[in-house]
A protein has these predicted regions:
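Enrichment for repetitive, rod-forming helical segments
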Residues: 9-11, 39
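Hydrophobic h-region of N-terminal signal peptides that target proteins for export
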Residues: 11-19
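Conserved hydrophobic/amphipathic secondary-structure segments
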Residues: 23-107
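Sec-dependent signal peptide recognition
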Residues: 2-9
Length: 107
């Protein structure tokens, strides 16, 4: 029984420390939601709704903007993320569901 309490205490303190690290990382940062669709469509509407509310759910309350990058069946946006975007967790891709099968069906 004593070991169980000690394990729970260790687990809870680890979670609290992780949340503090994330809050420090995202404080005063800007998230960019790269959407592989044009302005005014369904994906754009979802992304803009998410951008308005995401700051309340990420420690540090980062702001969020939407960047539309249509073209190539999501490949243009995916290539941007892979080749250009910073790899620090501040850029998120929102793509069509076909992006995973496109290379298999249209080589």
């Amino acid at each position: 029984m004593k070991h169980r309490h000690l394990t729970c205490f260790f687990f809870l303190t680890t979670i609290a420390a992780q949340a503090q690290v994330e809050e420090e990382f995202y404080r005063n940062k800007q998230l960019r939601l790269v959407i592989s669709a044009g302005v005014g469509g369904g994906y754009d509407a979802y992304a803009r709704t998410l951008a308005r509310h995401i700051d309340r759910h990420i420690p540090g309350n980062p702001s969020a903007i939407v960047q539309n990058m249509p073209g190539g069946g999501s490949i243009k946006a995916a290539n941007y993320l892979y080749n250009v975007a910073p790899r620090d967790g501040t850029v998120i891709l929102g793509s069509h569901s076909a992006i995973s099968t496109l290379p298999l069906t249209a080589p």
